[in-house]
Regions:
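Metallo-beta-lactamase
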Residues: 2-133, 140-146, 182-250, 269-276, 327-349, ...
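Cap/insert and terminal regions of metallo-dependent hydrolase folds
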Residues: 30-31, 37-41, 48, 143-144, ...
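Catalytic core of the metallo-beta-lactamase
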Residues: 106-112, 207-269, 285-293
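Acidic/histidine-rich helix-loop elements
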Residues: 122-139, 221-228, 279-288, 315
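Active-site metal-binding motif and surrounding structural segment of the metallo-beta-lactamase
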Residues: 132-181, 196, 266-272
Length: 353
């Protein structure tokens, strides 16, 4: 687990704190669209294009952040998130397609002998300088040093709980590791000397060895400070091999794009779809699926197996940290779906797909 490497004074702390708050409050406006640009592009950034999308009210977000901070300062959750020992023998078997939940949106996928890692985050705090932001609730059971060499890292967007500087720098030491990133993030990675970058736009496809890797849409937003709101793209990813294919949903609200992705690139044998950080709905609804919507997204992308992600690791919303899988499985049972195909993993658990 990473720790802060240098000392910060009180002024640095409050600057980081209020910067993080402002990042989520203000939907910074972007330039008007022009006919020459794709619909999700603007003059100086990106936007969501689903006709049902409506940005959360900034004042509502501010009031929620303040009240949430007050409530959390007087209460602590005691729920235990199930975890298990990492099965490195199974993961290192190149002839077995496997998937491991490391925590939050970080997963390890073995697909046709190659190793994929999604949104690697090992830091204790998901926030500026690893100083303020969402604190890790559940410790990871797998260290970076335990992992085999990673072939491809998929990044969904630049929020701190999905793009962690210390983690990507650790993986970038392996010069054979390639990073697939949404449009606009190449400069950030290059500033830290990270190479092997594949920057892609929605629906763009790239051949990598025997795989076709597709940058697919999501309904979300981006930003790491009050001044870069939606300057870089957010995405999901479809990975298509000769026999196997999987979908990484990243971070997204429910939108029509799930069905489009399923129609264009499905069926998938595996999908990694978020189920957590969904309350209150007036704040989270525009950018995060709830568990019921996650079930529908699973059906929309036409997947045979699902690993529920984006829960149990960081305290990011109002629902109890162990509530997402309960609501998710209730919806699975209500719809009469195959329980075994969507059963939530323990942190550190590996399954064959």
């Amino acid at each position: 687990m990473f720790k802060l490497g240098k000392r910060f004074n009180r002024r640095s702390f409050f600057r980081a704190f209020f910067g993080l708050v402002l990042t989520y409050i203000f939907p910074w406006k972007v330039k008007s669209l022009t006919s020459a640009l794709p619909p999700h592009h603007t003059g100086d950034g990106f936007r969501n294009t689903d006709p049902n999308f409506k940005q959360a009210d900034g004042l509502d977000v501010f009031n929620w952040l303040i009240s949430r901070g007050t409530r959390r300062s007087f209460s602590k959750e005691t729920a235990e998130i199930p975890s298990t020992t990492f099965n490195n023998i199974l993961v290192e078997n190149v002839n077995t397609n496997s998937v491991t939940w490391i925590g939050h949106s970080t997963t390890l996928v073995r697909c046709e002998k190659k190793l994929f890692l999604t949104d690697p985050v090992w830091s204790e705090t998901a926030g500026p300088y690893n100083l303020v932001g969402a604190k890790r609730y559940t410790s990871e059971t797998i260290s970076i040093e335990q992992l085999p060499d990673i072939d491809i890292i998929l990044i969904s967007h630049n929020h701190y709980d999905h793009l962690d500087l210390n983690s990507v720098l650790s993986f970038a030491k392996n010069k054979k590791t390639h990073f697939f990133i949404p449009l606009g993030l190449k400069e950030w990675f290059a500033d830290y000397g990270i190479q092997n970058l594949h920057e892609m736009d929605w629906w763009q496809e790239e051949t990598f060895g025997s795989f076709k890797i597709v940058c697919t849409p999501a309904q979300h937003f981006s930003g790491r400070s009050p001044f870069d709101r939606n300057n870089t793209l957010w995405s999901s990813w479809a990975v298509i091999g000769k026999e196997k294919r999987f979908y990484f949903g990243g971070d997204s609200a429910y939108f029509s794009g799930f069905k489009q992705i399923g129609e264009k690139y499905g069926p998938f044998q595996l999908s990694l779809i978020p189920i957590g950080a969904y309350l209150p709905r007036n704040i989270m609804g525009p950018v995060h699926v709830d568990p019921k919507e996650a079930v529908q997204a699973f059906l929309d992308v036409n997947s045979q197996m699902m690993l529920p992600i984006h829960w149990g690791t960081f305290r990011m919303a109002d629902e109890p940290i162990d509530q997402p899988p309960k609501d998710f499985l209730a919806e699975v049972e209500k719809r009469g779906l195959n329980w075994n195909a969507v059963q939530p993993f323990k942190i550190g658990e590996t399954k064959i797909w």
